[in-house]
């Protein structure tokens, strides 16, 4: 989790050029009626070569929230073990928000780095409702890998089809997969 606790994790200096990657697993798609189940962050260097994993939280939700999920969410989050983790968790959204802010403040200044991920606007909608301080920590801009995915599908289908997602649907795995996907598109679509 921390680069000081684990000597195998490379040191990453605090910088406004670092990127913060985030993923949430939710009970559904509507932040007005659904809730956050899991959240993870990874901070990378600007060139994506260094990665520092932040805390990963399964967020406790009432049985009514979990029982009210649709079949896709029940199946996906049941297979991944997330439903059991959420039931067993004592972490609230406020607890997770506080810990994530403390972690991020070690690597990036407030208000200047974009939120990075896949379809990150959806995660941001949930953060506005349930973790507004965390959402406000980020710049209003996003680095959304799904934009490149949609462009690759139309402009360079071989770049699109050559990246295979594992579809694990756990927050930390999805964050790493988003970073890997951006690296893929940087090479095969953007030629940077």
Swiss-Prot record:
Q: Where does the Exonuclease domain start and stop, copy by copy?
A: 19-182
List of catalytic residues? 140
Pfam families attached to this UniProt entry: RNase_T
Keywords from the UniProt entry: Cytoplasm, Exonuclease, Hydrolase, Nuclease
Gene3D superfamilies from the UniProt entry: Ribonuclease H-like superfamily/Ribonuclease H
Q: Which GO terms describe its biological process?
A: DNA metabolic process
Q: A single GO CC term, please?
A: cytoplasm
Q: Which domain of life is it from?
A: Bacteria
Q: Where in the cell is it found?
A: Cytoplasm
Q: What is its EC number?
A: 3.1.15.-
Which InterPro entries has this protein been placed in? Exonuclease_RNaseT/DNA_pol3 (IPR013520), Oligoribonuclease (IPR022894), RNaseH-like_sf (IPR012337), RNaseH_sf (IPR036397)
Any one GO molecular function term: 3'-5'-RNA exonuclease activity
Keyword Cytoplasm recorded? yes
The main location is cytoplasm
Its EC top class is hydrolase
Does the keyword field hold Glycoprotein?
A: no
Q: What does this protein do?
A: 3'-to-5' exoribonuclease specific for small oligoribonucleotides.
Which family does the UniProt entry place this protein in?
Belongs to the oligoribonuclease family.
- Which PANTHER family does the record cross-reference, listed alphabetically? OLIGORIBONUCLEASE, MITOCHONDRIAL
In Swiss-Prot or TrEMBL terms, this protein is called: Oligoribonuclease
Q: Which organism is it from?
A: Acidovorax sp. (strain JS42)
